[in-house]
Amino acid sequence: MAKEWGYADHNGPDHWHELFPNAKGENQSPIELNTKEISHDPSLKPWTASYDPGSAKTILNNGKTCRVVFDDTYDRSMLRGGPLAAPYRLRQFHLHWGSSDDHGSEHSVDGVKYAAELHLVHWNSKYNSYATALKHADGIAVVGVFLKIGREKGEFQLLLDALDKIKTKGKEAPFNNFNPSCLFPACRDYWTYHGSFTTPPCEECIVWLLLKEPITVSSDQIAKLRTLYSSAENEPPVPLVRNWRPPQPIKGRIVKASFK
């Protein structure tokens, strides 16, 4: 069987390029954001998300993260504006976290790592399918939200309560009537740059919108993510305690801010 990628020493991010050459590409994500080097771009517009809660379908443990999947067969849950020239359809969201609360996010801001990072993945509906969108530099838009430790967040708990149904790799459960807008911070300011998926095959097709303001969740809530397993039900248990990729070289890319 082909070696499967993961986050352990033997198959982790340092090895991904052996199977997925993109991982050593020129436009890889995540990156370290150094705010002193980021300039305000006054042409960047506000972004809007109009999500249909009825488009949420299932929640899945794929052995790498927990993912909530949406119906993207038509323009139903949409992201518009910001740096985007077209509307993008929400396909899924997932999370990255660490083994303790002092790290776990993939992007960092002036050296600060957050406890977790939420990624909402959308595809440009001018392309006739998600698979086609992956082949274009403007094919995918990901909204990244940082999670910091503080007060419990009730909306986040709705997601966490479903994790008991998907403890092990390969498990999937219904997850309906959820509007992910409830996980956005009040402030919509963002940084944007061109990058890649942070998991193999690491395709370089992503317009990133990283929200400046984190949302707050409790330490107990983040701990619940670590109760998932990267192993299947019939395998020796392997806890899914960390699933973040370290920062990648920026290689001359420009990061812009929507705010002063």
Curated annotation (Swiss-Prot):
User: What's the domain of life for this entry?
Assistant: Eukaryota
According to UniProt, the reaction catalysed is: hydrogencarbonate + H(+) = CO2 + H2O
Task: List the Gene Ontology MF annotations in alphabetical order.
Answer: carbonate dehydratase activity; zinc ion binding
Describe activity control. Answer: Inhibited by acetazolamide.
Checking CDD domains in the record gives: alpha_CA_I_II_III_XIII
Query: Which co-factors does it depend on?
Result: Zn(2+)
Q: Which residues carry this modification: Phosphotyrosine?
A: Y127
Q: Which residues carry this modification: Phosphoserine?
A: S29, S43, S50, S55, S219
Q: Name one Pfam family in it.
A: Carb_anhydrase
What protein name applies here?
Carbonic anhydrase 3
Q: Which species is this UniProt entry from?
A: Bos taurus (Bovine)
Task: State the taxonomy lineage.
Answer: Eukaryota, Metazoa, Chordata, Craniata, Vertebrata
**Gene that encodes the chain:** CA3
